[in-house]
């Protein structure tokens, strides 16, 4: 009878074929595990063990002042359903907790989404309340979560991630996740972090110095789109540019 391998012009014994199959299996298994490991590394780029996670933006006056003004601008005490994309360890929710009356805070519903499992686990422990829901999920597949519309969407330094289609995602958020007369707060980083210190000026690829044309291009796109949808738009801040939009419909 024909043995394994004869169809390729040579004869291969059963034992040799089994060895080769075993080698191929090991290589495939190793490649698959390596792929899984790299995916976890990407997901945990801003996770609990990262340098970014140890940064406390709430202790930076340049961030805190502009963010609190944005919350005042949207009348945060009147909001009931708040969605935060790229929530990380939920620093933005902590400021809201400090700003509003305790009884009002308990009536608000908070939803946070982040790609980092360790960050989401931390946020859940930080806010173990019934009116908080946190999801470890890819923002590109937000529709899989079946979220109800929110009257405030917050996203700080997330939408410009290289893994996201900025313009399409932004328009999808306005059309499908924001209530008709809701508000939105977007934070665009115009800084970089060096040894835990906030340094003014965003670092762009292929430049050895701060170059901000891409930053302002994205900000202008959002501003123009929201104005067409009947929103009043303000731009504030320095190290973080805060785009705040409130409905005038």
What are these regions (language model features)?
Residues 181-190:
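Conserved beta-strand signature within the Rossmann-like core of class I S-adenosyl-L-methionine
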Residues 197-223:
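Conserved Class I S-adenosyl-L-methionine
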Residues 144-153:
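A short acidic, Gly/Pro-enriched loop at the edge of an enzyme's catalytic core
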Residues 116-117:
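Conserved SAM/SAH-binding beta-strand->alpha-helix loop
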Residues 78-89:
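Conserved class I S-adenosyl-L-methionine
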Residues 89-105:
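Conserved SAM-binding loop of SAM-dependent methyltransferases across substrates and taxa
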Residues 9-76:
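Class I SAM-dependent methyltransferase Rossmann-like catalytic core
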Residues 161-173:
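A short, conserved alpha-helix within the catalytic core of class I
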